[in-house]
Amino acid sequence: MKQETGKKRIIIAIDGPAASGKSTTARKVAHLLGYTYIDTGAMYRSVTLKALKQGVLDSLHHSPESVSGLLHDIVIHFEGDHVFLDGEDVTAEIRSNQVSREVSFISSLKPVRDRLREMQQHLGRQRGVVMDGRDIGTVVFPDAELKIYLVADARERAKRRHAELTAKSAEGVELPDLDSLEQEITKRDRDDAEREHAPLKKHPEAYEIDTSAMTIERQVEMVCQLARARE
């Protein structure tokens, strides 16, 4: 959608815990405003996938500093809704359960956060961007004109994750049940909030939106209204 002329292009930072609706909201808001959407979670998942493919995850758990070698020549880019890692389309692979289990650990490594923060800030220089993640409003773009913090109860987020996995998984593939997903999400919340570098937290200026009982259309509408008031 074409950006309206005569309006200031702003940076919209959307943060929140796993499966709170960040990516879906950010993608739809970007489309409606004619902005660029940048999925930072996909970037961390891409690094995690690369570690898995190279078989270095165990060694990273023992020697986290060795992650620098993994980041040396990494290339992550987006084409529409597709994510490319070193030239390969990994859109589906980065949503696997294995990646989901390890991404919090990879995200806790300072060299990873530093490298991806540089990439994210470079992508946001053009302004007119919607970026979602866990530290966008607090670390990557603390001066973003609009900061949003989405929350939802763990059970509701587990239901969303299950629906996402069901839609994207091949027929016959066994999926984790709701209780397992809820436990995984709760652990991810704890890991994200307690990590040493750039922990998940709400910026004092962020608007908190509880999406537990809210339609995606309504939360998108709320964010767009807040954004248009700042353009």
Swiss-Prot record:
Of which family is this protein a member? Belongs to the cytidylate kinase family. Type 1 subfamily.
Binding-site positions, ATP? 16-24
What is the official name of this protein in its record? Cytidylate kinase
Q: Where in the cell is it found?
A: Cytoplasm
> Gene name on record?
cmk
One Pfam family here: Cytidylate_kin
A GO molecular function assigned to this protein is:
ATP binding
Organism lineage: Bacteria, Pseudomonadati, Chlorobiota, Chlorobiia, Chlorobiales
Q: Which GO terms describe its cellular component?
A: cytosol
- List the GO biological process terms: nucleobase-containing small molecule interconversion; pyrimidine nucleotide metabolic process
Q: CDD domains per the record?
A: CMPK, NK
What EC numbers are recorded for this enzyme?
2.7.4.25
| Catalytic activity field | CMP + ATP = CDP + ADP; dCMP + ATP = dCDP + ADP
Q: Where is the composition biased (Basic and acidic residues)?
A: 184-205
